[in-house]
């Protein structure tokens, strides 16, 4: 079997790894082995966090909806329950966008949800006893 010299291929491989690890700190951007290890970790973190990002956005939307709902004297839980009872199919992303950009429309949705909710006997009344 013929001998294979890897000089050019090895140089190209090292160059691509070092180019990809340009912004890393210390040896991780200068030494091939450290750069390769860091690149493996970085790709793993990127893969993991692309999935985690979806949950983080959902948390953000829920906290925005809750803040806007409480400004309209209803909790997030009761708002979602009322919207489901009223048959309004709007996802949390669009609901959060409405809460931020169009408060009047959000208030209208809150009124629809409030009308669809059954009257809660344990809820405190508006009158002082």
Swiss-Prot record:
Keywords: Ribonucleoprotein, Ribosomal protein, RNA-binding, rRNA-binding. One of its GO terms (cellular component) is ribonucleoprotein complex. One of its GO terms (molecular function) is rRNA binding. One of its GO terms (biological process) is ribosomal large subunit assembly. It comes from the Bacteria. Binds directly to 23S ribosomal RNA and is necessary for the in vitro assembly process of the 50S ribosomal subunit. It is not involved in the protein synthesizing functions of that subunit. Belongs to the bacterial ribosomal protein bL20 family. This is Large ribosomal subunit protein bL20. It comes from Mycolicibacterium smegmatis (strain ATCC 700084 / mc(2)155) (Mycobacterium smegmatis). The gene is rplT.
